[in-house]
Every structure is written in C-alpha cells, then in structure tokens.
Amino acid sequence: MIEDLWIIFRFLSVGILMLNVSLEDYRHFRVPGRSCLLLGCIGILDSIWMERSWVDCTMGFFVVSTLLMVLYISTRGKGIGGGDIKLMAVSGILLGCMGNILAFILACFFVVILYPLRKILFPSRKRLALGPYLSLGIMLTHLWGNNIIQAYLSWPGI
C-alpha cells in the first residue's frame, strides 16, 4: 500500500517538475535549479525506497551529463546551457544509467523531428530551448523506459 502511494507520488511529482522545467526553459531559456534539486531528491529517495544500486545511480548521474559538459566546454556555452547539464545529471539519479541514456536519445530524436516544424511555424525564434525535449525524454523513460529497453534488447541480432 505504502509502496503504491510512493509510486503515485513519484510519477505525479516528476510530471509536475518536468512541466515546470519545460515551460520555464521555453519562455526564459533557463532550467530552474530548484526543480533540478527536487528531482535529485526524488531520485535519491526512490533509490533508497526501491533498493536500487548506488552504482547505477552514480553512473546515471555522470554518463550523459559528462557528454553534455564536454559539449558545453567545446562550444564555450553556446551549444548547450548549464541547466540542461544539471537536468540530465539529476535525472540520471532517478532513471539510472541506461534510463538516462534512453531519455537523452529520445530527447535528441524529438529535437530532430520537431525542430524543423518549429522553424517553419515560428521562424523568428532563433534559439532552441532543449529543456522541453529533455523533459519529454525523461518523462517517457520514467513511464515506459524498462519496456522500451526490453523491447530493444529482444530484437533479433542484438
């Protein structure tokens, strides 16, 4: 019973936080630090409650965020923002290593699909807010990540 309440709380909280991140980043091009902090706290509590591996949470924290940090440094902050790095780091605590990689791949997929459409509809907006796409990838992975990973691994030849 309590475990079910925790799962409901976790899904609702992550959904609200991702909506907040999406709207704030879309409007003002910044990812709220408090949302990242709360997401990290939920990830830590979830890893304790569900008895997930600390190694997986730590790897999830570093794998994608390190790649984004390299991108940030190599473009001198013009290619990606620090808030996007923070968001993917703390989502790694919640999703684990494979889940965070999947969330990032889904976000990149949505950018590739939706960015040309956005360019046609809103040609005056030059900058791209990555937060909404990252949030979508995080939410989809949070909801169906294990199913997506299992479906991928069950393909013949993999």
Which positions does each model-derived feature cover?
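A membrane-topology feature that recognizes alpha-helical transmembrane segments
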Residues: 1-158
